[in-house]
Structures are given as C-alpha cells and as structure tokens.
C-alpha cells in the first residue's frame, strides 16, 4: 500500500528519509518518484476523505499532487533540483520539477508538460527500458525515434535529454545483461546525440 498522504506523521517520516539520502548522495538532483501510486485505498480512508473535503478536492489525484508539492518544496529547501515521474503531472496544478516521461501510452503527456514550461527527460517504457527482450524491432524503434508526429505539441527546447534504464529482476546474470543492453545502448547513445 502507498503511504497515506493525509497524515502529518507520514510527511515527517518521508522527510527524515530525504534528510538521510541528501547526506549520502551529493548530486544536485533528487528524484522523488511518485509513479504507479495505487490510490484505491485513499478512496476508503477516512483521514483522506476528510482532508479532501477540507481542501475542496474532487479526486484522490489531488492528494498525490499535494504530497508531491510538499515533498518538492522540502527537497528544494535542501538545495536540490527535484525530479519526478510524469505520473506526478497534474495539468491543472503542475509541480515545479523535472518530469521523467515513461508512460509512452500517453503520447500527449510530453506536449502538456513542456507547453507549461517544465523540463522533461524521455525514458519511454517501450523504447528506453533496455531490460526488454532484445529484438530487431526494439533496435529499429531506437534508431528511428522522432518527436513528431508521435508527441504532438512538444516544446523541444524543454527536453533535457534521454535516459535508458535496466530493471534486472528478469536478468539472471552478467551474460544475459550484456545481451539486453548491447547493442541497444549504442543505438540509444546515437539517438541521444542526434536529438539534443
């Protein structure tokens, strides 16, 4: 279950974790996540429902947005540039952070984010997750990447770059890792150089 965004003690708990992370990792960037949040239990939570009524919220997405806003401001107070998954983008009240776009089944999302003036990093699920089974189609999609017409309305100057990732829960050893990552990483590198 996700953390309850309506209890003050949960904010204190998360902030204490952030404090520890900031001490350990000196990067100027701090990614707060906020993806794939299962919100069904917030619909049933009396504390969440009470907060929604007090704040005039219509949807539980607004609870996540509130949580992201508070955590974003907290992390910024630590002198960090804040990043979060595009799941955290709520169009009517976007947060001032760098969005990491992964949900490629929402092709309008990069346009919505960048038109509001927010920076974005592309990390599309189907294209830039190098843990997918290697295929000619996968390589082709990397080599043939174009912003348009796939991402309507995108403001290219707000695209900071691209990021590839590998989730290793289905990759049992180094040999298999190499098969997944190469030559996709070369294609990804070329794509990144061409489009930025």
Q: Would you name each region that the model predicts?
A:
Residues 48, 100-102, 138-140:
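Short, hinge-like loop/turn segments at secondary-structure boundaries
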Residues 107-166:
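Aromatic-lined glycan-binding groove of carbohydrate-active enzymes
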Residues 77-80, 116-120, 187-192:
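Structural alpha-beta junctions
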Residues 154-182, 186-190:
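Catalytic grooves of carbohydrate-active enzymes
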Residues 2-95, 104-105, 110:
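Active-site neighborhood of glycoside hydrolase catalytic domains
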Residues 41-46, 93-95, 130-139, 174-178:
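Histidine/acidic-residue-rich catalytic or RNA/ligand-binding cores of hydrolases
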């Amino acid at each position: 279950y996700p953390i309850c965004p309506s209890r003050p003690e949960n904010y204190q708990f998360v902030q204490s974790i952030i404090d520890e992370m900031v001490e350990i990792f000196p990067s100027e960037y701090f990614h707060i996540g906020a993806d794939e949040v299962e919100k069904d239990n917030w619909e049933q939570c009396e504390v969440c429902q009470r907060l929604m009524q007090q704040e005039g919220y219509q949807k539980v997405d607004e609870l996540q947005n509130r949580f992201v806003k508070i955590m974003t401001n907290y992390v910024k107070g630590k002198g960090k540039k804040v990043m979060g998954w595009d799941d955290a983008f709520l169009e009517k009240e976007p947060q001032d952070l760098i969005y990491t776009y992964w949900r490629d089944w929402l092709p309008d999302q990069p346009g919505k984010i960048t038109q509001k003036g927010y920076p974005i990093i592309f990390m599309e699920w189907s294209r830039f997750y190098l843990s997918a089974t290697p295929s000619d189609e996968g390589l082709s999609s990397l080599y043939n990447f174009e912003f348009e017409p796939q991402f309507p309305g995108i403001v290219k100057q707000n695209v900071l770059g691209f990021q590839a990732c590998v989730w290793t829960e289905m990759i049992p050893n180094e040999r298999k890792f190499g098969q997944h990552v190469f030559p996709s990483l070369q294609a990804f590198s070329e794509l990144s150089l061409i489009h930025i």
